[in-house]
Amino acid sequence: MGNTISELAASIRSIPDYPNPGIIFRDITTLLGNPRAFRRAVDELVQPYAGTKVDKIAGMEARGFILGGAVAHQLSSGFVPIRKKGKLPHDTVRIAYSLEYGVDEMEMHRDAVQPGEKVILVDDLIATGGTAVGATQLLRQIGAEVVGACFVIDLPDLGGRRKLEELGVVVHTLVEFSGH
């Protein structure tokens, strides 16, 4: 697995000083554009849940839709998009969540997950954890059981993984990058 993980890390483009000076943006579009790396990433994201009954995969906008859809397909689970407010056409449930520099809102269709269903969160990256914590709270608000969260990238210096684990969510990541 170590070789696979180093190959995945090498397939992620790092862009310095984007979107702000001092930030290194981790761009997974290069991973997504490489069929072998994309397949390996999805296989590795799915691996901890093989043989586990998972009702739904919840993907966070926007790259979580790509990865989450692939994970849902592999696990024969349904897929639930968690979107920024105002983007879904039917009856929704919404929650405000904290960002590094403010507050935003996310929503999902109220009927997308039934109480008691087992759900895994999927996104490309966990940094401060604001979005993932908000998504966890949103899913729990409607009675879902969040049984895990998986991300291609973890930025451990920003503490997001720890915040999710403090909520009792088991976190699975593939690649760690230090710094911001």
From Swiss-Prot:
The keyword Phosphoprotein does not apply. Catalyzes a salvage reaction resulting in the formation of AMP, that is energically less costly than de novo synthesis. Belongs to the purine/pyrimidine phosphoribosyltransferase family. PANTHER family: ADENINE PHOSPHORIBOSYLTRANSFERASE (PTHR32315:SF3). SUPFAM superfamilies: PRTase-like. One of its GO terms (cellular component) is cytoplasm. It comes from Rhizobium etli (strain ATCC 51251 / DSM 11541 / JCM 21823 / NBRC 15573 / CFN 42). The keyword Mitochondrion does not apply. One of its GO terms (molecular function) is AMP binding. CDD domains: PRTases_typeI (cd06223). The gene is apt1. Its EC number is 2.4.2.7. This is Adenine phosphoribosyltransferase 1.
